[in-house]
Each structure stands twice: as C-alpha cells, then as structure tokens.
Amino acid sequence: MQDIQLDTLLSEDVTPENASQVMQALSQSLNEHNIRYYVDDAPSITDSEYDRLMQRLLKLEALYPHLIVADSPTQRVGGLALAKFDQITHLKPMLSLDNAFDEADFSAFHKRVTDKVGEVSFCCEPKLDGLAVSILYRHGVLERAATRGDGSVGEDITENVKTIKSIPLKLRGNDFPELVEVRGEAFMPKAAFEALNDRARAKDEKLFVNPRNAAAGSLRQLDSKITAARSLAFYAYALGVVEPDSHPLAKTHFEQLQQLKSWGLPISSEIKVCAELSQVYDYYKNILTRRSDLAFEIDGVVMKVNDIAQQQRLGFVAKSPRWAIAYKFPAQEEMTLLEGVDFQVGRTGAVTPVARLKPVFVGGVTVSNATLHNADEIARLGIKVGDTVIIRRAGDVIPQIVAIVPERRPETATDIVFPHNCPVCGSLVERLEGEAVARCSGGLFCEAQRKEAIKHFASRKALDIDGMGDKVVEQLIDKELVQSPADLFKLTASMMTMLDRMGMKSATNLAAAIEAAKTTTLARFLYALGIREVGEATAANLAAHFASLDALRVATVEQLTEVEDVGAVVAQHVAHFFAQPHNLEVIDALIAAGVHWPAIEAPSADAQPLKGQTWVLTGTLNQLNRNDAKAQLQALGAKVAGSVSKNTDCLVAGEAAGSKLAKAQELGVKVMDEDELLALLAANA
C-alpha cells in the first residue's frame, strides 16, 4: 500500500487544476514520514525515497509558489534574514524550577509535597541542557514559537524553530485542541556539536564552548538558514495553554506527554513514572551513571508530581511550581591555583571577595574567577593566596571553591585580609552583628553602588526607562551628569549628546523615555529603590498592603510582618531602609522631580463582600472577558484560583464548561452562570 502511494505521489501528472491537491498530498506525506522518523523511530521509507518526494514538492512549489502551504516541509530551510527579534508575551508565564543538589534537598521537597497532598508518584525525565521554548499550534498548524525570556516575555523565534526537523509543522491526527501550547527544550545533540566545531576548526573560526551555548546561539540567529544548518533537536516536556479549556486531556503528566507524542511531537525515551521514593533515587543514579553515554548533554533530572489534580492543589510560588524540582547532578570539579583576591562592591554595598584563579577548564567552560562570598567562608575554607584549590561549577553554572589541598600549600602562601575601607570610595567597611556580609557605608556616595543602583532603578522591571542601558548609565556617572536617581530627571537631550554614540535624535528619544518614566506605580517605585531582598512580588505586596508611600515610610517591623510573604528579616531591611535620612532625601528628590503614581484606594470591608472566598472561572464568557471578570472579583475581595477543590466557594461556568464544572458538581461547590455573575458585580458596583 505504501509503495503504491509513493509511486502515485512521484508519478502523477500535475496540471494547474490538480496542483494544489498533489502538493498538499506531498506535504502531508513528508510530514508524516518526518514524525515516523524523528518521533516514532520507525521510518517506513528509505532516505532516498524521502529525498525524491522532497525534490518533487520543491519543483512543484517553484512552478506554483502561490500554492505553498504553511505546513510544507520545504519551509524548514530558512527564509529571509530578520532585522531583529520581535517580543512575544507568553499566554501564561514560563516558570523556572527550584533545584535540589543532594538527597537532603530532594527529601525536603518530597516532604513539602506529601504534607500538602499525601502520597504521590513522580514523572521523572532527564534535565536537558538547552533552551526552553514555547510552541503554539492553532488548528494543528505551527503558528509561533518563542524563547522563555524573562518568563513573561520572550523572543519570537518562529522561523528558526521551523527549521528543527523533529518539530512537526502540522500536528498528527485530529484530536488536538483548537489551540495548544507545547513547551519543551531545544538542544544540540553531542554529535551535532562536535560536527559544528569540526567545521569551525577547519575554517579557523571561534569554537563553541558547549552544546548549550551552541543551541542558544543557533536559535537566536537572525538568519534562519544558519539555524537550519545547525542540526538542532527538540523534546517536548509539558503542555502549556490549551483552548478551549474544556478539551479532554489526560489526568497525569506522563499520559499528557503520550498525548503530545501521539500528535507527532518528540519526547524523551528516558521518561519514567516512579511510585516509590526509592525508585526516584534509583532513576537519578541510573541516569547519572549513563550521563556520558546519552546522545545529548544533561545536568540533572526533573521530578514532577505525576497527578495533574495534585499539581493544581500544590500550585506555584512566584517563579516556580511547587510540584516539580530539578535534581541536579554533582558539579564537575578541577584543581587550580589561587593567584590573588580582589574585592568587589555591589549595588547594595556588599563587599565580596573574588578569587583570581589560574584559568582551568571545568564543567564545559574556562573558569578564572570564583566568589569567596564573605569573611566567614574564607575562614571556613582556611584558604590563603597561593593555595591549590578545588573549583566546582555549582549547578553547572556558578564557579565555586569548595576546598583547598593542604598538602600543596607553599611556604609563601599569604593570608587574605578583608579591607577596612571600601576599595571604590574609601568609606569604612562595616559588618553588622549577625550578618555574614560586610558592606560599604558610603551608600549612594559610593560610585560602585551608585552605578548599580541607577542601573537597577532604570531597569525594565523597575521604572523601565527605555534606552537607559548599562553603558549609558556608566557614561552618565563617569561624566558626572548623574550622581543619584533623581538626577536622571534633570537630564536634557542636549546634555546627553555628550555621551559616546548619542546623537540628538537618540538623546531626544531618551529624554522622552525619562519623562514618560515619571508616571509609574507604587509597586514599581518600591522595587526600583533597591531595598535589600525586596523583589517584584514583595514590592507589589507592600504597595497593596499600605496603599501609600507615607504609610510605608513610618511602618514598624511588626506592621511590616503583617504583609503577605514578608518575614522578620525582610521587614527589618525595609524598616532600616526608611530609617536612613539619606534614603529619604533621595525619595523626596525623586518626588520633587515629578515621579508619581496613581493613588491606591484601600477597599473598605463593606466593599469586599467576597473577602476570604475562593472563586474559579471556566468556559467562555460572552459579555465579560475573563481578565475583567477576574479583576472585578478580586476587587470584591475574592481569590481567583485556576482549579476547583474542596476549598472553592463558587465556580462561574460560562459556555462549554468542561471538567471544572463536573468536579464542582461532584464536590457540591456552588455554581453560577455569567448572568448571575453580572448581577452580582452590578449589585456591588
């Protein structure tokens, strides 16, 4: 049957009337053979037969270019080069994973999980050392692909992803959702990496350090033809957004991966479900033992709670799911010489000793520096300049000195002496009782702190001054145009033309961006101040709780600990920050310069009749979009969750409500339709 079909595709006469039909049949056949080869590992035609089909399709597309379809396999070869990558906002955030570095870490994770949901099984898979990618299919056709980026916004790499032969341009079958997001890892197999470096070596070009860097660099090529020549691969590891959300999906992570495979997406053959903790450890040890024999680089294994309902009950923290963890392999280690120690001053004034090492190749990169953290760490290691040290790449990323080799210590070895004065500004270095970190007391007077503080202040997640990059900030400070954050708002376009490579047009645009940044939010402003351990989420919680800067400025430690996710340590940092006169002077100067934000109205108890309740939205709402409905419910005090549980107070069911409605009815949860929701919102408007 297959031979007859193949012969027909290769021999059928083509006319303008039947060209579209023949070309679609060729595309469909080639796509199916790609899946059989890359996903099923069961090719049904020879390479030469595949090439003949491809050549026939290419010839027909040359004759009838207006009939080329989006899922044609010829579209993998790469098109015109791009000028830049567009930004894509993910439909839902692409979170990272927490790490476990030993059995104690994993055991603690396991206890947190089982304390919350009881006994669990884990879906275990190798942690590929590549680049996280989101791929969106609409009606089964690949529509767009993006990098993870910062988790919320990534780069559009659609044309490059289309060149990866193992990724289907059109999904197999017809049981997939109308819209489905597939998340996975793009990587470069070891053999492809070696071949790439062999070609570079032959041309006397720069070599790639490791497959991960090669994969990342290949995916971020503006010319997709370069990507097409790099032999990248892809494994799917999760479903993302699915629409409609009523579409039936498997109830376990492992079964959902099998669904992805049935649609033609490649998944790792090393995936395994482990019901017992001992099986998880055995799986980890087995993969670790075979690490060097695998066709691709890995840096650990990922353990995910297999049951989707349990995943939903566990939920997420700010940047990672509570139901998954990356169990990292022991880092690779090498010995080298400690040649000296430099002291660096960070944005918060932390004075950090940095070891200067005789360069050594470890964990795939050449390491010449490593942090020594603080004086306590130096004392713990008993380390001296001139020692032979053991260097490790912790988590295969951050170089770390883990020990010295005492028997190799020379007589000329010298003690490491912490400076009494800041190496940048000369201010006294202080170490507060109970803190391991020594800090420069110079505050924003210290140039090192000033640069980093203003870089942070202008960054995208802070005041988001478009065009105010690190190099611009450094020049502004070096040329003494800016000494504090408030000075940014005194800059004029003509002043900024003094900067290197800053013409009047660029300076005018930057001046406009600075003016626009005056209008912000209280949460962004608090984050921009660079208060120790106050990240985006904490800044947002502080803003929501106190509603005004004046209230926050006078808050006590006790009042601060009442804020969600603010513990005693963070509360002390916040209180200490607002107790410093110099910090208050900077804040007052910023407000005087015109920085402002809309007032946050603290809701009264009467205005929040749903306070303490948990609501869930499902199905299609016709008169109100879901984001608006969620925002209005939250304004009434409700917590809006993504899944139904026994703790759910009410489910709002729109059209085509599916499994969430069934579960709510099973649990006896109150169900409300859209009209009832609108009536509730109107009554509380």
From Swiss-Prot:
SMART domains hit by this protein: BRCT, HhH1, LIGANc
Reactions mediated catalytically: NAD(+) + (deoxyribonucleotide)n-3'-hydroxyl + 5'-phospho-(deoxyribonucleotide)m = (deoxyribonucleotide)n+m + AMP + beta-nicotinamide D-nucleotide
Gene3D superfamilies: 5' to 3' exonuclease, C-terminal subdomain (1.10.150.20), 6.20.10.30, BRCT domain (3.40.50.10190), DNA ligase/mRNA capping enzyme (3.30.470.30), Helix hairpin bin (1.10.287.610), Nucleic acid-binding proteins (2.40.50.140)
An example Gene Ontology biological process: DNA repair
Active-site residues, Swiss-Prot/TrEMBL: K127
GO cellular component: cytosol
MF terms in GO: DNA binding; DNA ligase (NAD+) activity; metal ion binding
Coiled-coil annotated spans: none
Residues in BRCT domain copies: 605-685
Listed cofactors: Mg(2+); Mn(2+)
Chain sites annotated for binding Zn(2+): C422, C425, C440, C446
Function as written in the Swiss-Prot or TrEMBL entry: DNA ligase that catalyzes the formation of phosphodiester linkages between 5'-phosphoryl and 3'-hydroxyl groups in double-stranded DNA using NAD as a coenzyme and as the energy source for the reaction. It is essential for DNA replication and repair of damaged DNA.
Protein name as it appears in the record: DNA ligase
Species assigned in the record: Shewanella baltica (strain OS185)
